[in-house]
Amino acid sequence: LPDGIHVVYVSPLRALNNDMRRNLYEPVKGILEAAKDLGVELPEIRIAVRTSDTSPYEKQKMLRNPPHILITTPESLALSLNAPKFRDLLRNVRVIVVDEIHDLASSKRGSHLALSIERLENLTGRPLQRIGLSATIAPLEDVALFLAGFHDNGEPRDCCIIDARFDKKVDIRVIAP
């Protein structure tokens, strides 16, 4: 796996970012161990969190040995795009995942993030795969349009909406003496 950041995961909540790092690290570690047991050598997949809580030491460490998956906030993504050395690490990004997108889509933070995503796409020189996640999106089409953005001619970009909601069947019985 070439050095550089390939996936950017954005969440509005720093605590969620730390949880996501743990939730990604364990399965990746398990996959690497299982592959090794089968005699298959897989490349290391590095995961890092960059937020306002990230120490200067950790930021320098990321410059020397960049993560493949960067977990960040909208504000830290914007700052990363403005930092010349770190910006260079973002040139390989192919995928951006926006979690809790419902929280961002209709806010100033969301407008700022939309601009950062366009800047990131311009930096990479290719269309990014954009993935939005939420358990409470409504209406789906409006949020999808927010994430997909628009072409230079003002036309909305194509996107695919996957509605993974399901109706939970509840069986309630009242038993009274």
Question: Where are the model-predicted features located?
Answer:
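Conserved interdomain linker/interface between the two RecA-like ATPase lobes of SF2 helicase motors
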Residues: E118, Q129-P177
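Conserved catalytic network of the ASCE P-loop NTPase/AAA+ motor domain
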Residues: L1-D3, G39-P43, K61-N65, F86-R91, ...
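SF2 helicase catalytic motif II
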Residues: L70, P74-A78, P84-R126
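Conserved helix-turn-beta segment of the N-terminal RecA-like "Helicase ATP-binding" lobe
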Residues: L16-V49, F146-N153
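Conserved nucleotide-binding/hydrolysis micro-motifs of P-loop NTPases
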Residues: L13-N17, R22, D53-P56, E75-A78, ...
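Conserved motor-coupling elements within RecA-like helicase/translocase cores
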Residues: E44, D53-L70
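Conserved SF1/SF2 helicase motif Ia
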Residues: L1-M20, A35-K36, L123-P127
